[in-house]
Amino acid sequence: MDSQRGIVEQAKSQSLNRQSSLYSLTLDEVQNHLGSSGKALGSMNLDELLKSVCSVEANQPSSMAVNGGAAAQEGLSRQGSLTLPRDLSKKTVDEVWKDIQQNKNGGSAHERRDKQPTLGEMTLEDLLLKAGVVTETIPGSNHDGPVGGGSAGSGAGLGQNITQVGPWIQYHQLPSMPQPQAFMPYPVSDMQAMVSQSSLMGGLSDTQTPGRKRVASGEVVEKTVERRQKRMIKNRESAARSRARKQAYTHELEIKVSRLEEENERLRKQKEVEKILPSVPPPDPKRQLRRTSSAPF
């Protein structure tokens, strides 16, 4: 009985701590809390709104109970550091509200007949949900098993307690076995929080990790290998043609050199023969007698 009473009191304290967050207030109430900033809530973009909410919650005096208070404050501060997509973070609250109304107008006739809440009546958490910044979480009391090695059928007094920090981070905690003491939340590392945010915010993984290289599919890899092989074959064929032209030119030059050497050898031998043979002077020209008539008759 004492353990069941401790579980109920702990659940009540956690619900009160969650209700004290600005995320559960309406936008009119948030405007009242942010009234000192001097800027209208509708003209703020989502990035400025989340930063303002985070700063206001950080400056508020801590009135939480000892049991689970530090974990709830840590989860709310993690909400303020949420990474928004670039196109959505630059939109103002009025523009986001217009987009939400357009999506509602495109729904069914039954949804259009329902009472349409105004912008001031909507909570900040609902605005972020409908804007697509966060996704709704399903309660894990009926589906999730115990965490930390406990069994599902360990007893009626050991019911599973789920602590929800913000609308998109959930972690489990179990009551202490020996005595009903303060429940400490199951530790969630920064890496687990980043994985849960990236998995629940669909379509934002490319924006959050711009440096990550996408894994190439098998078809792209095959095309790349095929192009590389074709390029290698072309390079080999071009190198073979170049070697053939070079060999033909070298062979032609060798033939010309051999012909010139033969001609040079022939001329050298002819010159040596001319030196060995005696030089005969050319014969004198013969004188011929001519008949002339010098006496008259």
From Swiss-Prot:
Reported function: Binds to the embryo specification element and the ABA-responsive element (ABRE) of the Dc3 gene promoter. Could participate in abscisic acid-regulated gene expression during seed development.
Name of the gene: DPBF3
Record PTM Phosphothreonine, positions in chain: T118
CC annotations in GO: nucleus
GO terms, biological process: abscisic acid-activated signaling pathway; positive regulation of DNA-templated transcription
InterPro entries: bZIP, BZIP46-like, bZIP_sf
Keywords of the record: Abscisic acid signaling pathway, Activator, DNA-binding, Nucleus, Phosphoprotein, Transcription, Transcription regulation
Family under the similarity heading: Belongs to the bZIP family. ABI5 subfamily.
SUPFAM superfamilies: Leucine zipper domain
Organism whose genome encodes this protein: Arabidopsis thaliana
Region annotated Disordered, chain positions: 100-119, 138-157, 272-297
Subunit structure: DNA-binding heterodimer with ABI5/DPBF1, DPBF2 or EEL/DPBF4. Interacts with the AFP proteins AFP1, AFP2, AFP3 and AFP4.
Domain bZIP: 225-288
Annotated protein name in UniProt: ABSCISIC ACID-INSENSITIVE 5-like protein 2
Coarse class of the protein's main subcellular location: nucleus
Compartments it resides in: Nucleus
Record PTM Phosphoserine, positions in chain: S21, S43, S81
Region (Basic motif): 227-246
MF GO annotations: DNA-binding transcription factor activity; transcription cis-regulatory region binding
Tissue specificity statement from the Swiss-Prot or TrEMBL entry: Predominantly expressed in seeds.
Keyword Phosphoprotein: yes
